Amino acid sequence: MGTYMCDLCGWGYNPEVGDADGGIPAGTAFENLPDHWECPLCGVDKTSFVKV
């Protein structure tokens, strides 16, 4: 599992933390995020994220 960063706003998704506000529990790999998940800061879909 790796960290992914939003190309638009720079928000980082860390799978060890998850996205509690978005209903994503800690330990969820980026690849396992639901298709409808979007950046909690700017709202773009997960195709706008790059692995860092």
From Swiss-Prot:
Species the sequence originates in: Treponema pallidum (strain Nichols)
Family stated for the protein in its record: Belongs to the rubredoxin family.
Function: Rubredoxin is a small nonheme, iron protein lacking acid-labile sulfide. Its single Fe, chelated to 4 Cys, functions as an electron acceptor and may also stabilize the conformation of the molecule.
Rubredoxin-like domain: residues covered: 1-52
CDD domains in the record: rubredoxin
This protein's name: Rubredoxin
Segments traversing the membrane: none
Residues noted as binding Fe cation in the record, renumbered to the chain: 6, 9, 39, 42
Cofactor entry: Fe(3+)
A Gene Ontology BP annotation from the UniProt entry: alkane catabolic process
